[in-house]
Swiss-Prot record:
InterPro entries xrefs: L-lactate/malate_DH (IPR001557), Lactate/malate_DH_C (IPR022383), Lactate/malate_DH_N (IPR001236), Lactate_DH/Glyco_Ohase_4_C (IPR015955), Malate_DH_type3 (IPR011275), NAD(P)-bd_dom_sf (IPR036291)
Active site: 180 (proton acceptor)
GO process annotations (BP): lactate metabolic process; tricarboxylic acid cycle
Protein name: Malate dehydrogenase
GO molecular function list: L-lactate dehydrogenase activity; L-malate dehydrogenase (NAD+) activity
Keyword annotations: NAD, Oxidoreductase, Phosphoprotein, Tricarboxylic acid cycle
Binding positions (NAD(+)): 12-17, 36, 100, 123-125
Role played: Catalyzes the reversible oxidation of malate to oxaloacetate.
Catalysed reaction, written as an equation: (S)-malate + NAD(+) = oxaloacetate + NADH + H(+)
Gene that this polypeptide is encoded by: mdh
Residues noted as binding substrate in the record, renumbered to the chain: 87, 93, 125, 156
Top-tier EC class: oxidoreductase
Pfam families from the UniProt entry: Ldh_1_C, Ldh_1_N
Length: 312
């Protein structure tokens, strides 16, 4: 008898894609299909086999295959896109637009063909614009095309807060709004340590420094690595979102969602709090923003639109 499990396809078998595939399998969330270009089919198969051979040791039951044939992804419950060129030191996210938008269109055509009912999560940078590109190419309802940045940016923010206070990261909550770039908006006012507002625990000077470090978080890792970009935390963030969808958890998470008037913006993808469940984005949550917070979000939106103009 064949075991019927959920199915997740991960497009792009680089560091982030492969790590995502392994974490998905370890958590037994789904069978995993890891996909890359034909020239990299054997290395992709090798990575998948290596992961599968870890299953007896790690104690998980999940099938993992590597392939370059999108037919193997057919009827995926979730498809995660990590494919694209990597960000290099000194490279702005804007520099990635031309090449990665072409990759998105090519990949999305295959996804829509083989898994017309799937939910797509996009990681490829610049992720706000790439998610919009995938949305337009796929022709899916907006709820089923989602970008990942807020979970990652918020994780970085929570990490730095926990370090500052010498507390468990489990006790730190927070939200980061806006585009995935230097103009993102960590909302200190909606962030807490064990239910206590951060503003009562950390000085404004230190909070400002933590906010700035969060904004530069991706670049900090790029510069430290010297080659490539972060992949452990991005992969973990993708898995958290995927789990919320597959298990219909209706989690309140920050995600890149298509806006149609929420927060006063239209026809763009932007990082906002959402309810994430079995149908994808179940609802966009609108927070009340102070004037300075709304102005910061306006600046972030302007940055996102500037990148989107390159697409058009």
């Amino acid at each position: 008898m064949t075991i019927k499990r959920k199915k997740v396809s991960v497009i792009g078998a680089g560091f982030t894609g492969a790590t995502t595939a392994f974490l998905l399998a370890q958590k037994e969330l789904a069978d995993v299909v890891l996909v890359d270009i034909p020239q990299l089919e054997n290395p992709t198969k090798g990575k998948a086999l290596d992961m599968l051979e870890a299953s007896p040791v790690q104690g998980f039951d999940a099938n993992i295959i590597g392939t370059s044939d999108y037919a193997d992804t057919a009827d995926s419950d979730v498809v995660i896109i990590t494919a694209g060129i990597a960000r290099k030191p000194g490279m702005s996210r804007d520099d990635l637009v031309a090449t990665n938008s072409k990759i998105m269109k090519s990949v999305t055509k295959e996804i829509a063909k083989h898994s017309p009912d799937t939910i797509i999560i996009v990681l490829t940078n610049p992720v706000d614009a790439m998610t919009y590109s995938v949305f337009k190419e796929a022709g899916f309802p907006k709820e089923r095309v989602i970008g990942q940045s807020g979970v990652l940016d918020t994780a970085r923010f929570r990490t730095f807060i926990a370090q500052e206070l010498n507390l468990s990261v489990k006790d730190i909550t927070g939200f980061v709004l806006g585009g995935h770039g230097d103009d993102m908006v960590p909302l200190v006012r909606y962030s807490y340590a064990g239910g206590i507002p951060l503003e009562t625990l950390i000085s404004k000077e230190r909070l400002d420094a933590i906010v700035e470090r969060t904004r530069k978080g991706g670049g900090e890792i790029v510069n430290l690595l010297g080659n490539g970009s972060a992949y452990y935390a991005p992969a973990a963030s993708l898995v958290e979102m995927t789990e919320a969808i597959l298990k219909d958890q209706r989690r309140v998470l920050p995600a890149i969602a298509y806006l149609e008037g929420e927060y006063g913006y239209r026809d763009l993808y932007l990082g906002v709090p959402v309810i994430l469940g079995g149908n994808g984005i179940e609802k966009v949550i609108e927070l009340e923003l102070r004037e300075e917070e709304k102005m910061a979000l306006d600046r972030s939106v302007e940055s996102v639109r500037n990148v989107m103009e390159i697409l058009s």
